[in-house]
Design a protein with these regions (language model features):
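Glycoside hydrolase catalytic-domain context in secreted enzymes
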Residues: 1-498, 507-515, 521, 569-1004
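Terminal connector regions
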Residues: 492-565
Length: 1004
């Protein structure tokens, strides 16, 4: 043997192939473990359709567009229109807006080059194709200072002075350390200062704030300290102007005073209400010289084009605020209990924090029904009338811009207000006239009512707001001098209130009810005060302005009615369902809460967080699993795996109670049910036994987005608050239709959205995903959007039902409130979306109602959603992963149907123990009924005929990974074999070399 065997080479190759094989096997194991996630990300086929002979028209849901290009072009214009109709003009001194044609402007603030298009987390959107602000303005003929733009856009500025927001979903209060305004100091703009005079028609400042999933915004109060605003001077309040932003305004005011700039315009690019003290010199102590201000929310993909149209006068503002904007956000009574806290004695009961899951954290909705304007305007009325111990409350130094406020470039006059009563409704007409001389525009008409606050209410702990929105309408574009009569119908059920302590159902109080048409909630209360005889003069100036009696109507209810609305439209008796979420009534007995009450504002206004304590009963209720198996034999085991030959396509349009469903459900196997129910992450599984296709479900509060799962995304519309601020039902119905079109075009059948939680405070991380602080406008707009989405065969999952109004410690937080607040505020959006919009499905949430996870709270899911509202579709959990408290058995029993989880832990370890539990298997079967009923009536059935069948297949990536593992394993074995051979040969070669050496020495 002449050549030395290559032991080193084969040793190295063996090591490499062994490592690669081990890595591949580990990777394959992980990928197989998260099969659902990988299938979603790769959009991998898990089945094939075996086509039968049929000439049926199987396009059950059709597109209204002839091409993707036509759809995308239409949607781009639609998004801009939503922004143009939703943006609210707050201030416009001396007609600073619109800008003159060809105006030359300078854009200031980091937000000008880095707009907020939407928030972060599961609702985040792809904005790679979105126009920037400069492009949008230039398209309107406005010239933009390129020197300043390039400076803000430079690598140095983007690196050092970009706002800091949570980069990923997190779940703890500490996540807020990632928030920072981080505006550039004025000194950093010096290199562009010489360009200002040439672009001095206006200085346009953009103040942006970001929210995101998993992290609430810091307020600087209740433990949220100033370290959370990294490197910035300030008090830790993310929604106040930072020192650098104030410095920017100060310097612009100086330049305005010396003639460099003619006007200063501020745009509020945020879905979280920024404190507005800087717009009022009497409040903040400094005049920043701001001429005009406009709230634009989060603009979506093309909404900035709508903003540019407004600034250029191509469109006239007609949006109305869906939150009250304050000078100091701590004036909101909800702020004192907004951030979660721990039970002081949680450790005594071993209430755990298990990863992100929590047992011992809680939040109290001590403000009750007094959310946003329901507080500000009610306490104002009491202060005017001298009732309710309102104290020294001063509306004018509290509220900068009331709920519903929105100015215009023109003026409108209301006249001929008329209300007629029918058996079930009030029918309102109002003439609206454009009294301006220059600009055409739309006007939003808002209708409010006031319910009497009676002795019965005071005796029974019922609270009443001084004004509640009960209807609205938006005119067409009115030219100067033109008029339109709008019609608004108010169902009499809007007048009901919930009596949780005596009648324990909905009542309509005896007494006088007032209706009024108004431009905002504050004017509504002034109109009602005027109808009661109050004026600025006879209240010694406590009234901010005289109201208009001509825009009011009084209706008197002779006697208290506790029967008309005591039964829902489904025939279900309505009575208390949520006592367990009320600390004063819960069997957990965590402590007493004094709810905010207009019977005595001063004595009941929160001044510090409510302290509750854990009890043994509370700890028992908080157990991760409550079902003990005792009902296993209480029912007969349902039929499984029958060969009935029925396919899901045969059930299209079938009634939920059709007997054929039992025939179909009998065909399911236990494993098919478990696979579908426990692995519902962004899909419902393919089922061979009944020919059910796999569906794709995706996020979408602002439009279809696969930001988290890696699939296709579509048009990103404005944030939901901008949609609501349009007060335009038809427009948002069209948005919904187009979202449905996107889903139809991209193969999605379900949408995780719209978001239906409330703007409880300005600091919730996900306010951009939710419509408003008022449940009426939120519910009405949501119902319109839902109707549009589902018209294209896309089932919505309303999220989240309910009380997911904050992000801190959200996984398992104990949420406490009273039933009146639950029903009148926090469940009202779901009510309207289901009953008026026809929403198929809902997503529950991470939170608990009291001690009960909302996905395992029977009274919420079965009692309210299915019983009172009649919802027939499926209920999905929020992302469950391996969260222990989102228990399978408890959830199924309460009414949850499918777990938003890619983790097969439940599938492989938990579910099998119930295979012989007839009670749980029966609950699984009923969940499958709801899932299949929903899917059968969706666009998932497009292309399916009654003759088609389905075959479940192994997705290509599994085959590829198996092949890769096999090839690497074979290579490793070959390398090992060659290494062994090489080692043996080396021994022989070494011996030969030694012998040759000896022979050579002997020959010498």
């Amino acid at each position: 043997m002449s050549k030395k065997p290559k032991v080193g080479m084969w040793s190295g190759l063996t090591a490499v192939t062994a490592v690669l094989t081990a890595g591949a096997i580990v990777g394959t194991t992980v990928a197989y473990h998260y099969t659902t996630t990988v299938n979603n990300y790769l959009d991998a086929d898990t089945y094939k359709i075996i086509k039968g002979d049929s000439d049926e028209d199987t396009e059950y849901f059709k597109s209204d567009f002839t091409s993707d290009e036509e759809r995308e072009s239409y949607e781009a214009e639609l998004c801009a229109q939503v922004e143009a109709e939703g943006a609210a003009l707050l201030k416009n001194d001396n007609n600073a807006l619109p800008l003159a044609s060809g105006a030359k402007v300078s854009l200031f603030g980091h937000g000008s080059v880095d707009l907020m298009y939407g928030g972060t987390g599961s609702g985040s959107v792809d904005t790679s194709k979105a126009p920037n602000f400069k492009q949008a303005l230039e398209d309107q003929g406005i010239q933009v200072n390129s020197t300043l733009w390039d400076l803000y856009s430079s690598d140095d500025m983007m690196k050092n002075y970009s706002r800091i927001t949570p980069a990923a979903i997190s779940d703890t209060l500490e996540a807020n350390t990632q928030y920072a305004v981080n505006e550039a100091p004025w000194s950093k703009l010096s290199s562009a200062e010489s360009s200002f005079a040439d672009y001095g028609d206006a200085a346009i400042v953009v103040f942006s704030r970001s929210g995101g999933e998993g992290a609430d915004l810091p307020s600087g109060e209740n433990g949220t300290n100033d370290s959370w605003i990294k490197g910035q001077e300030g008090d830790g309040n993310y929604l106040a102007l930072s020192a650098e932003e104030k410095e920017l305004l100060q310097n612009l005011k100086t330049l305005k005073d010396n003639g460099t700039f003619k006007k200063i315009i501020v745009l509020i690019n945020s879905s979280n209400a920024i404190e507005m003290d800087f717009l009022n010199p009497e409040i903040c102590g400094e005049d920043y010289g701001i001429d005009s201000a406009m709230w634009i929310g989060d603009v979506g993909q093309t909404g900035i084009n709508g903003v540019a149209q407004l600034l250029a006068g191509e469109a006239t503002p007609s949006g109305s605020l869906v939150d009250s904007y304050l000078y100091d956000n701590m004036a909101n009574p909800a702020m004192y209990n907004f951030y979660t806290q721990a039970y002081p004695n949680a450790a005594d009961y071993n209430l755990l924090t298990d990863g992100p899951d929590v047992q011992g954290m809680y939040s109290v909705y001590q403000e009750g029904i007094y959310l946003d304007y329901r507080y500000y305007e009610t306490r104002y009325e009491d202060a005017v009338m001298g009732t309710g111990n309102a104290g020294d409350y001063n509306w004018s130094t509290t509220v900068a811009f009331p709920f519903g406020y929105g100015d215009s470039y023109t003026t409108f006059e209301y006249s001929d207000f008329n209300v007629t009563e029918s058996a079930d409704a009030f029918n309102v007409t109002l003439k609206v006239t454009n009294t301006g001389s220059t600009y055409s525009g739309k006007e939003t008409v808002q209708l409010y009512f006031q319910s009497p606050y009676t002795d019965y209410d005071k005796a029974n702990g019922i609270e009443k707001a001084s004004a509640e929105l009960c209807g609205f309408a938006k005119t067409d574009i009115l030219a100067p001098g033109a008029s339109e009569t709008v019609n608004i119908t108010v169902d009499k059920s809007e007048l009901r209130t919930y009596d949780a302590n005596n009648a324990k159902t909905y009542i309509v109080d005896a007494g006088d009810y007032y209706f009024t048409a108004a431009t905002d909630a504050h004017n509504a209360v002034n109109n009602i005060l005027a109808a009661k005889g109050y004026t600025v003069e006879n209240t010694d100036g406590r009234m901010t302005a005289d109201g208009n009696v001509a825009l009011t109507y009084k209706w008197t209810n002779a006697a208290l009615d506790s029967t008309t609305y005591a039964t829902s439209e489904t025939g279900t008796a309505i009575t208390n369902l949520f006592d367990e979420a009320d600390p004063n009534k819960s069997s957990s007995e965590p402590g007493e809460v004094t709810w905010l009450s207009r019977s005595n504002w001063v004595a009941t206004f929160p001044t510090q967080p409510v302290v509750l304590n854990a009890t043994q009963t509370l700890a028992d209720h908080l157990a991760f699993t409550r079902y003990d198996g005792s009902k296993a034999d209480s029912v007969e085991m349902p039929t499984l795996g029958a060969d009935n030959g029925l396919a899901l396509v045969s059930m299209i349009g079938a009634d939920y109670d059709d007997p054929q469903w039992d025939t179909l459900l009998d065909q399911l196997t236990f494993n098919e049910m478990v696979n579908t129910i426990t692995l519902g992450f962004h899909n419902t599984a393919a089922i061979e036994s009944i020919g059910k296709t796999r569906t794709k479900d995706e996020n979408g509060p602002q439009g279809l987005t696969a930001a988290l799962t890696g699939g296709a995304s579509a048009m990103c519309y404005t944030s939901e608050d901008v949609m609501a601020a349009t007060f335009n039902v038809d427009l948002i119905n069209d948005v919904g239709r187009c979202i449905g079109e996107d889903c139809l075009a991209m193969g999605y059948s379900g949408l995780y959205g719209p978001g239906i939680n409330m703007h409880r405070t300005a600091y919730s991380g996900r306010n951009f995903e939710y419509y408003a602080s008022d449940p009426f406008v939120a519910g009405t707009i949501c119902a319109a959007e839902v109707n549009g989405i589902q018209s294209k065969g896309v089932y919505v999952y309303l999220k989240h039902v309910a009380l997911n109004d904050s992000e801190s410690s959200r996984r398992g937080v104990n949420t406490w409130l009273n039933e009146q607040a639950a029903r009148e505020i926090y469940l009202e959006v779901a009510d309207k979306a289901v009953t008026d919009g026809g929403a198929w499905s809902v997503m529950s949430g991470f939170n608990r109602w009291g001690a009960y996870w909302c996905g395992a709270y029977d009274n919420l899911l079965t009692g309210f959603l299915r019983g009172e509202l009649g919802m027939r579709g499926m209920i999905i959990t929020d992302y469950s992963g391996s969260s222990k408290y989102m228990d399978l058995a408890d959830g199924l029993i309460a009414g949850s149907d499918i777990w938003d989880s890619p983790d097969p832990t439940i599938h492989t370890t938990l579910a099998p123990k119930y295979e012989n539990d007839a009670y749980i298997v029966t609950e699984m079967r009923e969940s499958m009924h709801k899932i299949l009923y929903t899917v059968a009536n969706s666009n998932a059935m497009n292309g399916w005929s009654s003759a088609d069948r389905l075959k479940v297949i192994t997705p290509w990536w599994k085959t590829a990974l198996y092949a890769l593992d096999t090839v690497l394993a074979v290579l490793t074995v070959l390398c090992i074999w060659r290494l062994v051979v090489a080692i043996k040969r080396k021994k022989t070669w070494t011996a030969e070399q030694a012998a040759n050496t000896v022979n050579a020495q002997n020959q010498q």
